[in-house]
Every structure is written in structure tokens, then in C-alpha cells.
Amino acid sequence: VPRTPQEIFETHGTAIRAGDLDAVVADYAEDALLVTPAGVVRGRPGIREAFAGLLAEIPDATWDFPTQHFADDVLFLEWTAVTGRARAEGVDTFVFAGDSIRVQTVRFTLERTG
């Protein structure tokens, strides 16, 4: 039985909070799309690289996902990630298919604080 979008995102959020890159990437379809202001990343290898960069910018961050609006197979998300040296705030949209994330858009700002 495929997981619901809510279950997939719960797993995804747990992996992000733990900084577990393997678990983060495992939530995506093999041919998933990650759409950012810098362009489109296709597939798990590119998604791994994108998340590795983000997690390196804000290591050991405290993550919060205060706004989560699910509608069918879509999630609108607002998030923050805070460390002793930086704060990131972002807005994402996810599209789920089957048991994974099929498409994600992301836009965030990163502010150095320390």
C-alpha cells in the first residue's frame, strides 16, 4: 500500500531534521524534478547534490515546518532552518505520485547570523 502524501512528508521531514541525506533522497522518485531559481535538477543524483549543498550551509539546523497545506497529491510548505551562524526561510511545493515525491519547487533565503 503506497504511503499518503502526509506520511511521505512526515518521513521526509524527519530525515531533514536528522541531516540524513540518504533518507532525504530516498523519498524522491528516481526521475523526480527539483525546480529552483537556479534551474531544474532531474533525478536522485542531482537532488542529492542540491540537498548536500543546503545541509552544508546550515549544518545541525533546527528545522520547523509551520505551514503545511495538503490538497490531494500536492503540499504547499513554508519552512525555517536555524543554526548558530545562519537562518534559512523557504517556500516549497511538492507533488507526490505513488510512494514518493515526484516534483518539488523550492525558493529560500539564507541569512548569515554569526
What are these language model-derived features?
Residues V1-E30:
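Short, low-complexity N-terminal intrinsically disordered segments enriched in polar/charged residues
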Residues R3-T4, V35, R48-G114:
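A beta-strand edge to alpha-helix "cap/lid" segment located at domain peripheries
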Residues D31-R42, E57:
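A short gly/proline-enriched turn/hairpin at secondary-structure junctions
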Residues V41-E49:
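Short beta-edge strand/loop motif at the mouth of beta-sheet-based domains
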Residues G13, G39, T67-H69:
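Structured beta->alpha junctions
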